[in-house]
Every structure is written in C-alpha cells, then in structure tokens.
C-alpha cells in the first residue's frame, strides 16, 4: 500500500505506535501532530534563575548553543539563506515530519543570523531544492577552532557529581521516570546525580515550550535547565538528554562518521541540513572508542526526513551484509558506557550497587589482590533507607595509619563525604551504618604484599529515627515498585520550636477503600499512639501535612500481593509566620505557605524593595533634579510580567544623565525577554539611547533634551535582581568653550572634568595639560606599554623608563604590536633599549629603532628594564608592546632562601591547563640544594598522572628522580645529592588547583637524604 493510500488517522496511528521508525524523538518540539503550547502548561515552580536552553542563541537539533559555542563554531559560508522555509523550522532529533514546529525560533535562521553577526559572513548560493546541499567548505574546515564538551574542562562536572532539581509541575510518574533515567547512568558509570543542596551549579528539570533540549556539559556559574517538554517524557529520551548534560554530542557528528554511515541529503527536510554537519577532530573527542551504531546518542535512519519511509542516515553493511539498527532509545550502549567512563576517568574496578542487598570483594578474592589497584563501589538505595555494611573477611597489608593498602568507607555519595572508617590488616571491622541512603567504599593497594583481600555484604534497612531539618523519604525500591512484606517506621524530628512539614511528589500505593492492605500511616507525634493525621493509599497525592510539634511519625506497610511504585516525599522544618503578632512583617496581607510565607498587597499596590511593605505600582512622572530608580522589588528579584515607564523631566537647557549602580537582567545582547530601554524624549518615538539586558552595567547616558524616558519590561519566566540607577539633571558645561579644558572636556553628572592625551598629565589648575613623567613600575603579569603620546607622535627630548617585575620563577616576554622610531644604522638618535634585569646596568637584550617590528624578547629572570629616548629632532609614531610572563628558566640558589611560584597569577587564580614548565636550580659550587614547599595544592590522583610536580637530581629528566607529587598539603623537604636540580610542573586540560610555592636555597650539609616517592 503506497504512502498516499494511508489515511491521516492511519498515519497518526503508525507514528504513535512506533511502527514507522525505530526510535522517535521530537526535540524542542512536540511529538503531537497538532502541537500547540498552552502557556498554562509551562513550568509553574518557584522561579529559579537558570540558564534556559529554550532561550539559547541557536539550536543544533536538541542541543542548545550559546554565544560561547558560536564564537568557536563555524559552518559553510555557502548555505542559502534566501530559500529556507523558516516558518517550518524546529528543533528535533527524532523522526520524520515538521508538524507542529514552533515558529518562534527557527533553528537554521537563528544559526545563520548569529554566525553572521559574529562575522563569519554568509553568501547566497542556490543550494536548496534540486541543488547541491550545504556542506563544510575546505576553508572553514581549516579555520575550525577546537571545541567539545568532552575536551573542555569547564564542561565536565567535577567529581562526576551532578546536583539536580525537579520542577514542581511534573507528575509523580514523571519524577519517578527521571530518577530511573539518572539511576541508569549511575548504574553503568561513575557519574552521580544528587538532589541539590547548596551547590552553585546544578541542573533543573523543567517543562519548557521548546520541548526537549539541553546544553552539552556543565555550563557553570549557576543552574542550567534540561527541558523535558510535551511528549518527551520517555525513559530513553530522558537518558539521551542526560547524555548531553554529561557532556556528549550526537554520535553521527563524529569526524569519522563518513566511514560508517552515508548521509542522503536529498531526503533531508529543507532547512534541516545543518543538523547533519560533522565535527572536526579538534571539536569532539571520541576518546578512542569505535563508531557506535547502537549509541543512545545516535540519530535514527529517518531523522528530519522528507517522508516517513525515506532514509536520511544509512548505516554501512557489516561483514554479514546487514545494516545495523541505529537510533535506539532504550538503554545505554556498551560504547556509551565506555565513553562516559573514560570521560569521567572512572576506576577500572568497582561498580554502583543499587539492589537492597549485595556483596563486594577485592579483585582476585580470596586468592590475593594485585598491587596498585584502585576500586570504588557506590552503594545507592532508596532515600529513607540506611545501609548496613558488614565485612566478612579482612586480610590486607597492615601499615601505620593504613597508609599503603586500605579500605575507606564514607557516609555519602563521594570521596568528600564524612569518613566512617579506614581499615587495613587482618582485623575485621565492625558493622558500619550510613546515616542516609548512600555509601562510598574505596579500596587502594600500593604494596606487593599478597593477602586474601576483603569481602563484605551490605543490606538496606528502612525506617529509623531521623534528626534533620530537611530531607527525603521514599518507599523501599522507589522509583521502582516497592517490595512485598515490608514494614518501615520513621520518626522525623526537626529543631525545637518548629513543626514538621511534609509534601508528596509522587504517590501510588495499592488502592483499597479503607487502605486495609498496602498503606502509609502518618501520625502527629513521636509514636504509633500519637493522633492520626491520615492513612493513605491509592493514586491521589495526599495534601501537604503540617505537624503540631517538632515530631512526625510515619509507617509504610506492604503485604505479599500487589506492589506499586510507592511514594516520594520531602520533609522540612515549618512555622506559621502569619500567625505571629507581626504577621511576618507584612504591611497588608500575609499568605502562609508550607515551608515559607509570602507578603501580598491590595489591588493597585505592589511589594516594595523589602518584600514586606506595599507601595504604588512602578513607574511615574519624576520632576526632581536628581533621584534613584530601581526595578520593582529591589534588591530582591523583580516580579514577572512587569512594564514600568518613568518619565524624567528637567528644566529647559538642562540635560539628564542616568548612571547604573547595579544591573542584572535576564538575557544577552538580543534582549528579547527582560530589558530596559532609554530614550531622549517623552515617548518611544524619540531618540533611542539603547536597549539593555544581561549583567554588563551600561555606560552613563545623557539625554539630548530636557526629558528622558526609561522603560523596563519583564516576561513571565526567569527573574533576576534587576537594576538600581541614579539620574541627575545639570547643564552641559562642555558645550561652551570646551569647558575651558586644553585637551578634552568630559561632562559628568553634576559637574565636568578635563582630561589629557597620552603622555600628558593634568595641570594643578585642572584645565591645562603638561608633559607627564616617564617612569613606571609594572607588577601585573601582562599588559601594554606605549611610547609617550601614543598613538600620536612622541614628543622630543623625552626619556621614559619602565621596570617590569613578575612573580619569582617566571620570565618576562616583550612582543611588539607596532613600532615606528626614527631610523639610524646604530640607533644613535631616538631608540628603545631593553635590559635583562631591573636596571640599565643589567645585560642588554636589544637596542631598537626604525620601522620594522622587532622580534619578541625574553628576559632570563623575572625582571626587565626598558628605556625609551628621543632627541630634539625627528619624531615618529612610537611603539606599542605587550608584556607577558612565561614559566620556567635557570635559577641560581644561594645560602639566602629564594622563592619560586607555580604560575604567574598564584594567589589570585588557579594554575592554567596544559602547562609544562621546567626550572633548573643551580647551587653554589660544592653545595647542595634544599627545596621546601610552603604551599602545595595540585590535582590529586593515585599515580599523580594528571597534574604533578616532579623533581630530578640533575640537569634533565633522565637524572635520578627525587619524587613526583600531587594532591593537597606540602611534601617533605627535598635535598639534592648534586649541585643541580630540575623541577618539572605538568598540568593536563581538566581540573586546576591553587598550585605551589617553593622556597629553595644552597646548603652545605654532608648527610642529606632523598625524599621518598
């Protein structure tokens, strides 16, 4: 039966039932053929200032790209902009069709416009229907700049820990499915998802109008959303989106994809060709893994297809002549797991244990464990359960403080959780019990001693006394079905003087009219004899619960028959602020909410900056000469859907200036959502000074007339802190006779100032200019120096000096950007001299003149002296040069201690990535070297294989090693045998730390010892 013979009803049934294609993933759009977005369906949780993928600069399928991505991403300059059907563009990574594509943000249109805006330059070319499809140009391939979350350290979640928040408008089953997807990643990798506490960076599951989309990797500097929109709440889709969060691009964009699949461009929907661009080797790191047809990150065969039976991606046949299936959305593939484990450097030994009971043992048990082994087990059970760990055998090498071979058990989800114990030797440890639902077990061996190893069993127990002010309680095995024949009793106690608040996120317990079988019982007190609040079962979430004291008693019971998904609840300390005499400090209305309260105002009023008092609505007519304007609610976040207009009017012949003291609005340079507009004049038809959003404080603006219009608008989503601005009306003194200034007059609010050009300073009379002194001392690690009066000609009879000092252990480099000094064969007239030290008596590095840009110059130490001299005759433009620092060099040690620092910005910033620095320390003849670490903080790893400091007893790395060091805390002093030592500092491209500070000196000591590795 042909495609045309299928009725619309049959087509719809085929799509929904999944028969048409192997996997369907509509992303940044809905799967529904008649997709429309109801504003009432948007996330209704308490506003969180998150990075919203739906407001990204552009989309690449379901991947949100921001300005940082665009600045380092280029596409072919021959894409046709004129014939693209922008109205039909959407954001999907699934199957056929363009039904219901949101028209608000056409992906290709956005992509081209943004790249054009940053200067890529797009040309028209008839490459659409019936023409050659767009492809990467050779030039753009050469010009690609490396980019990939997997190779950019800031995109990797530290320690593999990803805090999360789930928006409040998701159903219980959706929440359970999100947790199942996260547990799926945890089960097979060393990535850990944990409910957010006070972490700055975390993900927020939201329901956004653009459907399903996410950024790739960690964005940092606050929360970021993962949008799970309409018809995207499927297990496989969420696992896929979490793959982007973890740091993965789509498999079919790998650089080697043409060896494995064929892109059939004539079958691609017009305007969606860019979704099939492939990345360059420097842009994505496949971590040495083979191309993975089975990856959950792979497109399906008919993604963005013109017709449901037309392939856009055709996999190559295998050795048996069979084309492998692609685009599955069921589970992680072996390749997905291998790549994730490499990306997050998971130990080769250990696993994540999620069953209610189980066992673990050292490798090779009971026949002995290998040396230099590192294993990590993560035990993760249901919140509300505790983990009981019992070691059945212990036979490890015994050492002081268990320094060599040991087992560490921690009460939590990662290596920084509280330590329950560190064990070695042959004494079996006692029973260990966690305080919550996670436990970290780490085993390390570094000796060659052969023992049996260890074996342990664990069990999850539900119930118990909980003394916390907030936390989670879930039925055993949640989000999977609870187990039969369970009885769990919890007694929750919060701080004295408070109540216990309990809210349910999910609830599904076997239904019965009187809850006679499976049920949850909640009592207002500390025991089963306390007053009954409710006995709950069925599928309806119970109402929020508030105890009358600081204690709440809960009991969950399941029988031996029907099992359901169970429940998930949050508890916290609660008080009714509105019941207090001052009603929480609210001026007009107090609204108590569980866990908090809100002040409200009568109609015609809005909350003031303190969020308690009420004042007239924002905006208005301002006739004062000066004053302050703030966003509604300042200094708290401004409310949504606000439109405030201030009309500022000053006397005639006056001008109005506005200066922002603080500025933080949603948005970037597009300013489509929340923004401030400033006009010279009374209406929006007047002269526009600018439209502003984001976090950059606008420049001071002065009106052209005696009135100014300031308009603020916010949309219904993300709110920020807003702005605080001061306006001031004054006459423009610079408009008459340049304000009496010899060079430049700058009008300021309420006054004016005179300024002088480069090479001159302001006279004591504050109006005239005189030549400046030419002596500067520079201590910054990088910057510019210029000849006097730059970029105009330098003055005659001038002598200027610069002394540049860098942090000890670093050399100064001088690179010239422009150079034009009077020419002479021996530079006898005007010239620039550079010395290798702090004075003109130091060795000279160069004497420069003429118009040829000199080669860069480098000092041997951390100081450089520069002198510029001009005579009485010819003047030229002069020079502009950049000074910077480089690590390493030859350092002379004396009996007086000297200092050496790991990087130029030590103390201000962490060391940068991809460093390889070598310092050669030479002592006085007949002496040795003493190295004393004053500060040491370098990325920690068992073998110091990532970032490390290595010391050698000689001229090169072939000499005897005195130690390789990493981690936190200074190593012991190091003594050389000879009079020369080499220090090598290496960093990779991921985690950066504070660095190190070494004090070294020359000593005469006959019995020095090598430091131990």
Swiss-Prot record:
Alphabetical UniProt keywords: Calcium, Developmental protein, Differentiation, Disulfide bond, EGF-like domain, Glycoprotein, Hydrolase, Metal-binding, Metalloprotease, Protease, Repeat, Secreted, Signal, Zinc, Zymogen
Cofactor: Zn(2+)
Entry keyword Cell membrane: no
EC number(s) given by UniProt: 3.4.24.-
CC cofactor note: Binds 1 zinc ion per subunit.
Removed propeptide positions: 31-147
Compartments it resides in: Secreted
Database matches in InterPro entries: BMP_1/tolloid-like, CUB_dom, EGF-like_Ca-bd_dom, EGF-like_dom, EGF-type_Asp/Asn_hydroxyl_site, EGF_Ca-bd_CS, MetalloPept_cat_dom_sf, Peptidase_M12A
One function term, GO molecular function aspect: collagen binding
Disulfide bonds: 190-346, 210-232, 212-213, 349-375, 402-424, 462-488, 515-537, 578-590, 586-599, 601-614, 618-644, 671-693, 734-745, 741-754, 756-769, 774-800, 827-849, 887-917, 944-966
Gene Ontology BP term (one): proteolysis
Tissue: Highly expressed in brain and kidney and weakly in lung, skeletal muscle. A perceptible level of expression is observed in heart and testis.
A UniProt-annotated Pfam family: FXa_inhibition
Ranges for domain EGF-like: 574-615, 730-770
Major localization listed first in the record, in broad terms: secreted
Chain segments carrying region Disordered: 124-150
Domain CUB intervals: 349-461, 462-574, 618-730, 774-886, 887-1003
Protein name as it appears in the record: Tolloid-like protein 1
Organism (species): Mus musculus
């Amino acid at each position: 039966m042909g495609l045309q013979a299928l009725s619309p009803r049959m087509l719809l049934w085929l799509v929904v039932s999944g028969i048409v294609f192997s996997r369907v993933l509509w992303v940044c759009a809905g799967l529904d053929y008649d997709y429309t977005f109801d504003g009432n369906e948007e996330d209704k949780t308490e506003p969180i200032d998150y990075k919203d993928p739906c407001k990204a600069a552009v989309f690449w399928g379901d991947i949100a790209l921001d300005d940082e991505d665009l600045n380092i991403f280029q596409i072919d300059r021959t894409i046709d902009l004129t014939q693209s059907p922008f109205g039909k563009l959407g954001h999907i990574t699934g199957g056929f069709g363009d039904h219901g594509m949101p028209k608000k943000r056409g992906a290709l249109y956005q992509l081209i416009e943004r790249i054009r805006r940053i200067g890529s330059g797009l040309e028209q070319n008839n490459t659409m229907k019936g023409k050659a499809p767009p492809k990467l140009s050779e030039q753009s391939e050469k010009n690609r700049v490396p980019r990939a979350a997997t190779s950019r350290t800031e995109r990797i979640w530290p320690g593999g820990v990803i805090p999360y928040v789930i928006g409040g408008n998701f159903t219980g089953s959706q929440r359970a499915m999100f947790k199942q997807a996260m547990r799926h990643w945890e089960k097979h990798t060393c990535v850990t998802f944990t409910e957010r506490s006070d972490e700055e960076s975390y993900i927020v599951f939201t329901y956004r109008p653009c459907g399903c989309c996410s950024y790739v990797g960690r964005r940092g500097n606050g929360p970021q959303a993962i949008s799970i929109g309409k018809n995207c709440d499927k297990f496989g889709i969420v696992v896929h989106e979490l793959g982007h969060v973890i740091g993965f691009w789509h498999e079919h964009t790998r650089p080697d994809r043409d060896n494995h699949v064929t892109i059939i461009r004539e079958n691609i929907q017009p305007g969606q060709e860019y979704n099939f661009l492939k990345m360059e080797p420097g842009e994505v790191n496949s971590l040495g893994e083979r191309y993975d047809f089975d990856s959950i990150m792979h497109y399906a065969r008919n993604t963005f297809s013109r017709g449901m039976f037309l392939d856009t991606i055709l996999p190559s046949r295998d050795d048996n002549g069979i084309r492998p299936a692609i685009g599955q959305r069921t589970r992680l593939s072996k390749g997905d797991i291998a790549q994730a484990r490499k990306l997050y450097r998971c130990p080769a030994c250990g696993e994540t244990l999620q069953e209610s009971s189980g066992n673990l043992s050292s490798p090779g048990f009971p026949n002995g464990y290998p040396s230099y082994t590192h294993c990590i087990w993560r035990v993760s059970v249901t919140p509300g359960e505790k983990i009981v760990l019992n070691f059945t055998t212990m036979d490890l090498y015994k050492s002081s403080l268990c320094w060599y071979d040991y087992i560490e058990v921690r009460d939590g989800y990662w290596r920084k959780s509280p330590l329950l114990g560190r064990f070695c030797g042959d004494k079996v440890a006692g029973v260990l019990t966690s305080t919550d639902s996670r436990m970290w077990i780490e085993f390390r061996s570094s000796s060659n001693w052969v023992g049996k190893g260890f074996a342990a069993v664990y069990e999850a127990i539900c119930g118990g006394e909980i003394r916390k002010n907030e936390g989670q309680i879930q039925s055993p095995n949640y989000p999977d079905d609870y187990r039969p024949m369970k009885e769990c009793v919890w007694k929750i106690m919060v701080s004295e003087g408070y109540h216990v608040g309990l809210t349910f996120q999910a609830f599904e317990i076997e239904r019965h009219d009187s809850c006679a079988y499976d049920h949850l019982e909640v009592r207002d007190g500390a025991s089963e004899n306390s007053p009954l609040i409710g006995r709950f079962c069925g599928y309806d979430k119970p109402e929020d619960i508030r105890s009358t004291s600081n204690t709440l008693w809960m009991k969950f019971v399941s029988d031996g028959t029907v099992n359901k998904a169970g429940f998930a609840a949050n508890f916290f300390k609660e008080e009714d602020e509105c019941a207090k005499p001052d009603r929480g400090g609210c001026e007009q209305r107090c609204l108590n909410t569980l866990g908090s309260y809100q002040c409200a105002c009568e109609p015609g009023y809005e909350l003031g900056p303190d969020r308690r008092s009420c004042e007239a609505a924002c905006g208005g007519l301002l006739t004062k000469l000066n004053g302050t304007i703030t966003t509604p609610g300042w200094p708290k976040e401004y409310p949504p859907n606000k439109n405030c207009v201030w009309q500022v009017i000053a006397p005639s012949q006056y001008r109005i200036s506005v200066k922002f003291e603080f500025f933080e609005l949603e948005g970037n340079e597009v300013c489509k959502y929340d923004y401030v507009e400033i006009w010279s004049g009374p209406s929006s038809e007047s002269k526009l000074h600018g439209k502003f959003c984001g976090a950059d404080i606008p420049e001071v603006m002065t009106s052209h007339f005696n009135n100014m219009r300031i308009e603020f608008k916010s949309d219904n989503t993300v709110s920020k802190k807003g702005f605080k601005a001061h306006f001031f009306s004054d006459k423009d003194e610079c408009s008459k006779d340049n304000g009496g200034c010899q060079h430049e007059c700058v009008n300021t609010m309420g006054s004016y100032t005179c300024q002088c050009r480069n090479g001159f300073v302001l006279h004591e009379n504050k109006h005239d200019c005189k030549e400046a002194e030419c002596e500067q001392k520079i201590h910054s690690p990088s910057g510019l120096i210029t000849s006097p009066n730059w970029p105009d000609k330098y003055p005659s009879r001038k002598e200027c000096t610069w002394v540049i000092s860098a942090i000890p252990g670093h050399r100064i480099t001088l690179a010239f950007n422009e150079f034009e000094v009077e020419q002479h064969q021996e530079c006898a007239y005007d010239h620039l001299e550079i010395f290798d030290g702090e004075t003109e008596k130091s060795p000279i590095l160069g004497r420069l003149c003429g118009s040829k840009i000199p080669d860069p110059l480098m000092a041997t130490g951390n100081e450089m002296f520069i002198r510029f001299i001009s005579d009485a005759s010819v003047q030229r433009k002069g020079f502009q040069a950049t000074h910077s620092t480089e690590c390493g060099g030859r350092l002379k040690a004396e009996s007086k201690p000297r200092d050496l620092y790991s990087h130029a910005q030590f103390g201000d910033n962490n060391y940068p990535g991809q460093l390889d620095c070598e310092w050669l320390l030479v002592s006085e003849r007949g002496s040795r070297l003493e190295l004393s670490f004053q500060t040491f903080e370098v990325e920690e790893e068992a073998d110091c294989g990532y970032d490390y400091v290595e010391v050698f007893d000689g001229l090169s790395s072939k000499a005897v090693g005195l130690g390789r060091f990493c981690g936190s805390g200074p190593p012991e002093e190091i003594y050389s045998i000879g009079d020369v030592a080499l220090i090598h500092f290496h960093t990779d491209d991921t985690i950066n730390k504070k660095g190190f500070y070494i004090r070294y000196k020359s000593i005469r000591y006959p019995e020095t010892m090598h430091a131990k590795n």
